[in-house]
Structures are given as structure tokens and as C-alpha cells.
Amino acid sequence: MRDLTSATDSASLESDSSRNQFIINSLLPWYSCSEHEFPHRKARKRRSPKNLDWSVSVQMPLVTSKTKESEKSPKSWSAIAKKHVQGDSPVKKSHSVPVPSDRSEKKSFNSSLGELIETYSPSLDAPRPIQPRGFINTGNICFMNSILQALMYCVPFYNLLKQINRMVPYNFERTTPLIESLTMLSRDFREYSEKFDLQGDSILPEVVYSATKGNPRFEMLQTGEQEDAEEFLNLFLDELHEEFVRERRHYLLKNDERNPKSDIKISNGIKSGLDSFDDQSSVEASGWTEVGKNKKPVIARSATVERSPISQIFGGQLRSTLRVPSARDSVLLEPFQPLQLDIQAEDIHSVIDALEHMTAPEILPEWHSSKGNVTATKQMYIESLPPVLILHLKRFFYEASGGTQKNYKPIAYPARLSIPQNVFSPSVRGSIHPEYDLNAVVYHHGTSASGGHYTVDVQQLDKSGWFRIDDTHIHRVPIHDVENSELSADPSLSKLGHGDRVAYLLFYTRRS
């Protein structure tokens, strides 16, 4: 190493040129180029900052200036948070999930979900298979676990959740807690492009459980009481329906469109419709006139349900006809969800038997009319069927001597269900030929209506196989163990202590 204090170096420092050469050759050897070849950095004049106006509407594209650089989307979602909407309401915070790139406008949660509801049509297209995951039972919630599994493996319902995840930003205000909880739960089920054998880790459906807190409909979840799976399904779908209806109304009102008619709950709509047949005078009080059999005029009324994705997926319609001597026939169109099937009669041994029994005429003695008490008849037909047909096999009945009892009768149900034409109303008979594929079966184990245990068999979304799910226990089963499964002995059930299993809820999806 050179001695920087040598006499030679001291002399070289006396002149500027020598000093520069010394620095180049000794101290900074990487600056080895000559002075005239050295790439001097060009001086640039710093531009003065511009005051940008971020007061833009969420309905307009984000434009901050006229330069090409500013025409691009903001690089950070924090920049969007600095904006505010024209008017009184600020921009709502959104989840970290970005708005789809195919949309040129930034939409709020309400407008996005409302638009989706207004334009929604159920999709029967099979998605990719998902990895099965068990649900942890924290105590007497097997009824909820079984219903949630059946819904997750229902193709139109899963496609709906997937569509919401893709198109609607997260809502931090929790105005639709059940919708948001289900979309979040669906993200825990990973999709696969190839077949797989291993199941995912079991999870606690805490997000759904939390969404029910404070809702009086789901008080049984907070008290730890066992609940009937069919009753929970009805309450759950009703609440989902109402959340969708509220968002649709908000969207229509915001866009200055017509105000929808009053909402009628699906489960209550059926009951109120039947109660309206109490007497002939109430039947004739409202409704419209139809031309019935032999061109005889009939009074027709309808218990309508406001449209939502839930009613579009699961909701069907029944036609109930009341015939009273010396009076016009009365017709009531009633919604159903699910379809209740009585199986108590001795001649009912299959789902088809139960459907045909449902449409048999019912004798109503001592019917009160304007001409006194008469014998009337009431007959029920299917007017329309939904994409997903849920059949409730009414296993429990009441006896004055023994209270609520359970019917263990084996009921045959096929993997492919063809609805017979004689169960449809004459007005639609012959015009529709629906066929359904079985995709989930919810079972009840035990003797008590207020207790016991629930499990479920579900078909993979792409129809590649079946899984038997008992809370966190999952294993594959062949289709012949699912079809009419209560007629066959299953060794695994004996080991679990559930040898009294019977089918309780059947989920059928219409063939596309």
C-alpha cells in the first residue's frame, strides 16, 4: 500500500492537475476514465408538486390528471381510502380483495351485491372439486354442521357463494352477516384440478356461529340445545333470503326503480296460505278468476315470495284446490321450501309413493260455508319445481299417549329421481319432465326428536364420488351405500354407536 504522506505525494499536491490525477489513480481507482469521458449526471429541474383533486365519485373512473401516467389505476388501496364520495356519505372501507379487473367502475358493497341479486340466475355448471373438511362439534351443533356441509356441496349454492366472492367487496358494516359468513366459509374449501384422496384439516365454523349471535331465530345455538336439522335449515334459508331481499330493495331504491312488494317469508307463507282456506267467504274476498275443468270458473290467489337467490335456487310452488258443493272452486298457489313428505301411511315405502300420496284428495267434513256445514275436498299438486329440490321425510309424529315418536320405516329414494306426471297440476302436466340427481342426504340417529345425532353424505361437486361426514370424521363411500342407505347395514355406523340411522333430508339437483 502507498504511503500517503511521502514527499513525492506532497509535491504532487501543489498543483491542481497533479492533485486530480492523484485522486483518480490512487484514492478512487474505479474512476479510471479521463475527465472528458466521465459521464456527468445531468442536472434536472425538480417539478413543483401539483395539487390533485381526489374528490371523485365511486361511480366514475379514477382520473387524477391529464397525463398518461395518471390514467393508470392507483398502486395502493390506501390511496382509494383518501377519496370520498360526492355528497354526504364517505367511501366505505373494503376488504383487501380487489374489485374485478373487468369492471371499470368502483362500486360499493350494496350496489355490487344488489346488482348481482337483480341479475342473478342459478348456475348448474359443475365447478372443480373441493377438498373435504370436517366441522368441529363444540357441543350439540351436529345439526348445523350437517346442514352447512350439504349446502357447501350443493352446486348452485356453491356457485352463488363463489360469484359473491369474485364480484362483491367485503362489507365491514356487517349488514348481511349470514351471507358474508358463508362466503368466508367457502374460502376454506380449496378447489382442485386433479383428483385427491386426503381431506383437509377440520375447522370450526366459528364465522357462521358468530353471524347468528344476537339473532333470536338462532337462540338454540347460544344455549347449546340440540335442534332439529330441518327446522334449522328453514330458519337459515329464511334469514339468508331476507338478507338478500333487503340488499335488493336498497339497490332498487338507490337506482330510482320501483319499490318491491312486501316480503313474505317462505316458511310462513305456506302456513298463512293454508290458514286462508278457513271458510268460503275468506276465499272469495280476494283473488282472480281462472277457467277450470269443464270451463267452470275458479277463484285463484297466490301467496307470493319476493325474489332472491335463495328462492330461485330452493323455492318451488304448490297448487292447492278447494272444492265446496254449490260454490266455485278456489285455487291457492303456495311456495314451498323444502317439500314436506308425509310417510306415515302404511302404503308409503318410497319417495314416489310419498309424492303421489301428497296429491291424493283430502276430505274435509263439516266444512263451514254460506249454506251451512258441507263436505269439501282439497287437493294439492306441484305447480313448479326449483333447481334444488329438498325433500323432508317427516319422521316425527305426535301421539296423545306417547308424545312425539320417530318413524323408522325404510323409505326408498333413488340416485336419479324422475318426478311422475300425475303429481303436477293439470295446467303444467305434460309440459315439464324434470329429472334430478341426488347430491346430499342428511341422516338422523337416535330415538328422540329433540336429541340424537346428525350426519350427512355429500357428493363431490364434479360428481366424482361421495363422502360420509360425521362432524370431523370423513371417508369415501360408494353410491350404492348412499342410495337407500337406511336399508343396508353399515359396519362403520355400528362402531360409532349409530345403528339406528334413517334418511331425514334429501337434496336433489336438477339435471342440466
Swiss-Prot record:
GO biological process, one term: regulation of protein stability
One cellular component term from this protein's GO annotations in UniProt: cytosol
CDD domains given in the database record: Peptidase_C19
Gene3D superfamilies: Cysteine proteinases
Record keywords: Hydrolase, Protease, Thiol protease, Ubl conjugation pathway
Source organism phylogeny: Eukaryota, Fungi, Dikarya, Ascomycota, Taphrinomycotina
Molecular-function annotations in GO: cysteine-type deubiquitinase activity; metal-dependent deubiquitinase activity
Top EC class, one word: hydrolase
Reaction(s) this enzyme catalyzes, per UniProt: Thiol-dependent hydrolysis of ester, thioester, amide, peptide and isopeptide bonds formed by the C-terminal Gly of ubiquitin (a 76-residue protein attached to proteins as an intracellular targeting signal)
Signal sequence range: none
EC number: 3.4.19.12
Domain of life: Eukaryota
Name of this chain's protein: Probable ubiquitin carboxyl-terminal hydrolase 3
Region of interest (Disordered), residue spans: 64-109
Homology family: Belongs to the peptidase C19 family.
InterPro entries, per the entry: Papain-like_cys_pep_sf (IPR038765), Peptidase_C19 (IPR050164), Peptidase_C19_UCH (IPR001394), USP_CS (IPR018200), USP_dom (IPR028889)
Domain USP: from-to ranges: 133-511
Organism per entry: Schizosaccharomyces pombe (strain 972 / ATCC 24843) (Fission yeast)
Disulfide cross-links: none
Stored SUPFAM superfamilies: Cysteine proteinases
Keyword set includes Disulfide bond: no
Annotated catalytic residues: C142 (nucleophile), H453 (proton acceptor)
